[in-house]
């Protein structure tokens, strides 16, 4: 646990903490519309105070945009996005989201800017995107889950083979722009494009259920396949799912409801 220190000489917007190991950290923060916003930790007091002053400048100057941000190296890019969205749209998100009229952008880096439908706003405002190799993940169900799984893509999907971005932008995950070419066994996008339907072919297609994510639908299909394989001595193929741990898979498998 870190212990806060009160220091009258510390510049405004900066406070000092010490870790249990005795390391000194300089944290910066700013207040906007009665909301206290952390700007992160810095190696020294000067850098922390500069981050605070830069944050104030961003909040008070509507002419400063993300395109101008190369001039403000003192403030972390993620924090700049959060502050500009709060300034321009009056809404605070803990992730680097900037709202547009009928979609939103998630600014991972200045070069990597995702575009999502508004219906995905709640999810990505509470799930931080990370990059590992050439793939993008969020922490969900206690594991790293590919962001593509939310849109019906298999883990480690390859553009051109498993999906196609219609406008050519590989970061534009709006459903109107994403054509899924290869998905999980027994999983299709719902007609309203707000979730996923799991189904299995018996004498015809039998609906297993409606699910918010493709991952849940794929696990529901596996559960239905297991039941039918045992009950009717069938040999339905199963989805190979390696994006969550065995423990998490079992938790979802055991709790998921089927409409069979």
Per-segment meaning from a language model:
Residues 1-260:
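Boundary-flanking segments of nucleic-acid-binding domains in nuclear regulatory proteins
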């Amino acid at each position: 646990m870190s212990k806060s220190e009160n220091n009258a000489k510390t510049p405004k917007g900066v406070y000092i903490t010490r870790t249990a190991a005795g390391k000194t950290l300089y944290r910066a923060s700013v207040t906007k519309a009665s909301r206290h916003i952390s700007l992160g930790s810095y190696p020294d007091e000067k850098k922390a105070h500069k981050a605070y002053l830069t944050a104030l400048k961003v909040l008070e100057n509507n002419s400063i945009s993300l395109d101008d941000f190369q001039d403000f190296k003192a403030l972390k890019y993620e924090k700049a996005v959060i502050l500009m969205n709060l300034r321009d749209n009056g809404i605070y998100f803990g992730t680097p989201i900037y709202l547009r009229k009928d979609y939103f952008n998630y600014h991972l880096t200045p070069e990597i800017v995702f575009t999502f439908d508004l219906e995905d706003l709640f999810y990505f405002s509470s799930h931080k995107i990370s990059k590992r190799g050439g793939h993008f993940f969020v922490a969900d169900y206690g594991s790293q889950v590919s962001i593509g799984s939310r849109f019906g893509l298999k883990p480690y999907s390859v553009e051109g083979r498993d999906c196609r971005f219609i406008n050519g932008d590989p970061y534009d995950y709006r459903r109107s722009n994403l054509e899924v070419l290869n998905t999980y066994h027994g999983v299709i996008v719902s007609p309203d494009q707000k979730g996923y339907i799991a189904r299995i072919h018996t004498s015809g297609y039998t609906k297993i259920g409606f699910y918010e994510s493709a991952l849940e639908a794929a696990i529901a299909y596996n559960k239905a396949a297991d039941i039918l394989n045992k009950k009717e001595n069938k040999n339905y193929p199963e989805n190979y799912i390696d994006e969550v741990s065995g423990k998490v898979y079992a938790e979802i498998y055991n709790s998921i409801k089927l409409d069979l």
